A protein has these predicted regions:
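SAM/dcSAM-binding transferase cores
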Residues: 445, 449-508
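Class I SAM-dependent methyltransferase Rossmann-like catalytic core
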Residues: 264-288
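Short, solvent-exposed loop/turn elements at domain surfaces
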Residues: 250-253, 262-266, 454-456, 482-484
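Alpha-helical transmembrane segments of multi-pass membrane proteins
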Residues: 1-234, 244-251, 259-264, 286, ...
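Short, solvent-exposed loop/turn segments at secondary-structure boundaries
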Residues: 268-269, 377-380, 411
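Short acidic active-site motifs
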Residues: 354
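Short, conserved SAM-binding/catalytic segment
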Residues: 334-344
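Short alpha-helix immediately C-terminal to the canonical SAM-binding loop
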Residues: 330-331
Length: 508
C-alpha cells in the first residue's frame, strides 16, 4: 500500500482495525452457540468464553506492540490476518477432534467448558489482538498527532466490536448458522489480508506451503465432519435437534435443546408421557383435581409441547394456554414432533411477561417447565414471580415447577421451598427415585393453598411409576433452609446454589 496517499492509507488502516475487532466479537458470540451442544449455556460457560477471549486479546495486544517496535510493516499485518484466518477455519476441525476425548473425561462442567474455549478460540483471539497495536503504530508514522490517531483506532476497535456483537447475535446466528459464520469469517480475514500482502514475495516454496495448508485444513475438516451442522435449526436461543426413538412405545421423537434432551413425544397415543418429571406433573394435577376435564392450564414453556399435547388429546374441553419464548421451538414441535397447535393458545414471549399481561385470566394449574438443564432463568424463581402466579391461580389452584439440581443436597430446590412457603400453604418436592451416589436430578416442586399432598403418588395412567414426597427429608438433611436465601428479583444467586453441578462430575 506504499503507493496510496496517506489519507487513503489511514482510512484503510482504520477499516482493518474496525473489521478485525468485529470478527473477534463474531467469534465470541458464535462460541456460545458452537459449544452449546456439548456443554450447554450458562453463566459459567459465558464467563469462560469472555475470559479466554479477553486473555487472548490482551496477549495479542502486547505482542502487536512488541512486533511494531521491531519495525514490522504492512506485510506483518497481512501475515497475521492470514494466519488468523487459518486458525479461525481450524476451529471446525478442532471442535470435532477435541469433543470426543473431552466428553469422555470425567471433568466438571466448568473445566470442560474452559478447555473447549481455550482449545478453539484462544489462538484466533491472540492473532486478531495483534492487529490493532500494529496498525496504530503504522498510522503514527503517517500522522504524528498521537492522541488523535490512538483515540481514533481505539474508537474504531470498540465500534467494530459493537457491530460484530449486534450483527451476530441479532441476525447471523439464526439466519445462516454458527458453522457457516465461522467459514465466512475465515474467508473475510483472507480477503482483508490480501492488500497487505501485495509486497510479499511469494517464492515457490511459500506458495506451495500455503496451498498445502489450505488443502490440509479443508481435508481434515471434511474427514472429521467439521462442516456438518449438528442443529436441525438454530434460533436466537437454542441449537435444536430432533432424534428418532425406537422401542416398544412405537414411533417416537425427542427434542434436544443444545446438549440436553428436553422431552419425548410418542406419535400415538399422544397422552403417553415417557419423561418421568412430565408424567409426575400430569399425575399431580389429576390428584389435585379428581375431574380435570375442563381445567384451565397455563404452561410456562412449551418445548416439545409434550404435556400440553397430552392434555388437549385427553381432555378436548380443557383450556390450554402456552407461553413459549422461542417461535422456532414451536415450529419444530409442529413440523417434527407430532404436535397439532390447533385448540391450544400459544403466546410467544417470556413467561413472566406473558403471564403478567393476562390480568383478566384465572388458571386452575400453572405449570412452569422452563428450567432447561442448568440454564435457569432466575426471574422465574423469585418471590415476585411466585406472587404473580398466585394472583393468576384459582383460590385452590396448583402450581408446578421442574428444577434441575444436585442430589442429595439440592440447595436451589431448598431455597425455592423457602421462597414459595411465603406465598403458599403447602409446598412439596417430588422424585421418582433416590440415586445411590451424588448426581444431578430433576425435581418437581408443587405449591398450593388447596389440599395437602400425599407422601407417595402412584401413576394412574401410563408407565407404572411412583413418586415420593421428600420435602421433610430435605428440610432435615444437608444445608438448613435457614442458611439459604429467599429468592427475590434483587437477590437470586442461582449459579452459586447449583455450583456443585459446575464444579463436580455430578453436573455432567
Amino acid at each position: 500500500m506504499s503507493g496510496r496517499r496517506p489519507i487513503g492509507t489511514l482510512f484503510w488502516y482504520g477499516t482493518t482495525v474496525f473489521l478485525s475487532s468485529a470478527f473477534l466479537l463474531v467469534l465470541e458470540i458464535v462460541a456460545g452457540r458452537l459449544l452449546a451442544p456439548y456443554v450447554g449455556v450458562s453463566l459459567y460457560t459465558w464467563t469462560s468464553i469472555i475470559g479466554v477471549i479477553l486473555a487472548g486479546l490482551s496477549l495479542g495486544n502486547w505482542l502487536g506492540g512488541r512486533i511494531a517496535d521491531r519495525g514490522a510493516g504492512e506485510v506483518a499485518v497481512g501475515v497475521t490476518l492470514a494466519v488468523a484466518a487459518a486458525a479461525c477455519f481450524a476451529i471446525l476441525a478442532l471442535l470435532m477432534l477435541v469433543a470426543r476425548p473431552l466428553q469422555a473425561m470425567e471433568l466438571s462442567l466448568l473445566k470442560t467448558s474452559f478447555v473447549y474455549v481455550a482449545a478453539l478460540f484462544f489462538l484466533p483471539a491472540v492473532l486478531l489482538g495483534v492487529v490493532t497495536p500494529l496498525l496504530t503504530t503504522l498510522a503514527l508514522r503517517l500522522d504524528v498527532r498521537t492522541g488523535r490517531v490512538v483515540g481514533r483506532m481505539h474508537a474504531l476497535a470498540a465500534l467494530g466490536s459493537i457491530t460484530g456483537t449486534f450483527t451476530t447475535g441479532y441476525w447471523l446466528v439464526q439466519t445462516v448458522g454458527s458453522k457457516t459464520i465461522i467459514i465466512a469469517t475465515a474467508i473475510a480475514l483472507v480477503l482483508l489480508a490480501l492488500p497487505y500482502l501485495r509486497d510479499f514475495r511469494f517464492k515457490g516454496g511459500a506458495a506451495l506451503g500455503v496451498i498445502v495448508v489450505i488443502v490440509a485444513l479443508v481435508s481434515v475438516t471434511r474427514l472429521v465432519q467439521g462442516f456438518v451442522n449438528p442443529c436441525l435449526k438454530e434460533s436466537g436461543y437454542y441449537c435444536l435437534r430432533v432424534v428418532d426413538q425406537f422401542g416398544d412405545e412405537g414411533e417416537a421423537r425427542s427434542l434436544v435443546l443444545d446438549h440436553l434432551t428436553h422431552s419425548t413425544n410418542i406419535k400415538h397415543p399422544p397422552d403417553r408421557l415417557m419423561v418421568p418429571y412430565v408424567h409426575a406433573m400430569d399425575e399431580l394435577v389429576h390428584h389435585h383435581y379428581p375431574d380435570p376435564r375442563v381445567l384451565r392450564y397455563f404452561f410456562a414453556g412449551g418445548g416439545a409441547y409434550t404435556h400440553p399435547r397430552a392434555v388437549q388429546y385427553r381432555y378436548p374441553n380443557a383450556t390450554v394456554t402456552v407461553s413459549e419464548l422461542d417461535p422456532v421451538v414451536t415450529e419444530v414441535a409442529t413440523s417434527e414432533l407430532f404436535f397439532d397447535p390447533r385448540n391450544i393458545r400459544i403466546l410467544h414471549g417470556d413467561a413472566r411477561v406473558v403471564l403478567s399481561s393476562l390480568a383478566d385470566q384465572e388458571f386452575d394449574a400453572v405449570v412452569t417447565d422452563v428450567f432447561h438443564d442448568i440454564a435457569i432463568p432466575y426471574h422465574l424463581t423469585t418471590k415476585e414471580y411466585h406472587q404473580l402466579v398466585k394472583t393468576r391461580l384459582a383460590p385452590h389452584g396448583l402450581y408446578l415447577i421442574n428444577v434441575v439440581d444436585v442430589f442429595p443436597d439440592p440447595r436451589l430446590v431448598k431455597a425455592m421451598i423457602k421462597t414459595l412457603a411465603a406465598e403458599f400453604r403447602y409446598v412439596d418436592v417430588w422424585v421418582d427415585h433416590a440415586p445411590s451416589a451424588p448426581t444431578r436430578l430433576t425435581y418437581v416442586v408443587s405449591a398450593t393453598n388447596g389440599q395437602p399432598a400425599p407422601n407417595r403418588l402412584r401413576a394412574r395412567r401410563g408407565e407404572p411409576r411412583t413418586w415420593y414426597n421428600i420435602t421433610d427429608i430435605l428440610a432435615a438433611t444437608g444445608t438448613k433452609l435457614s442458611d439459604l436465601p429467599a429468592l427475590s428479583d434483587d437477590f437470586a444467586p442461582i449459579e452459586r446454589l447449583i455450583s456443585t453441578l459446575f464444579f463436580s462430575e455430578a453436573g455432567r
